[in-house]
Amino acid sequence: MNADTWTRLQAFRHALELTSCEASLTAGYDHLKDFPAGCSELASQTLTDYLTEDGSNLYSCIVGMQWDNGPGRYGHVIADPARDYIDLTLDQFPGYHNRIVAEPVESGGQLAADLNREPAISTADGIVASPSDKVNYITEQKNRQPMVIITECYKLIRMTARFIPMCQSSQLFQHQVFPRLFIISDVGSCSLFRNTLDRLATDWKVTLSILSL
């Protein structure tokens, strides 16, 4: 990751924090008031859109995790633009303190260690971009990082209803083996931003412009 991208990550995270404090900007997005808690999907989706809006056509995808914890099904989402895992909300969980976690896909670092990619599970259209994009079922929890077994403050079924049908990947949720890691969608095939997040994205871009002055 180059210095320019890292600077943009810092600015975007700062913009998210500022947005969460502005009641007028969070109307209809109540969970933003608790940022970073419960905001992994929103942060990852909009970050990837932001990083690729310059027309660079970088390969990007959104990576999700889901698991059962008692009666509920829960999840966490990170971004993978240009072969880097990026998590802007990991510090919502106990024991994680970095505001931004970013590492190359092949680094074997904190995030990559939780994405053990051997048997392939493809996206709905059957596309897995490269061997490094493969994901698999996790069958043992005892040696997993806490991120895999803790619960985020919103249930994944809520994300399913809002996001997954737009990406035509809802069948990924029909399997009953958890926890599980999967590639949700290529960003380019998802209309989430255009349909529901345009106003917030615009607000963030204004904030980012101010921060860059």
Curated annotation (Swiss-Prot):
Superkingdom of origin: Bacteria
Keyword line: Plasmid
Protein name: Uncharacterized protein YuaU
Protein's organism: Escherichia coli (strain UTI89 / UPEC)
Organism classification: Bacteria, Pseudomonadati, Pseudomonadota, Gammaproteobacteria, Enterobacterales
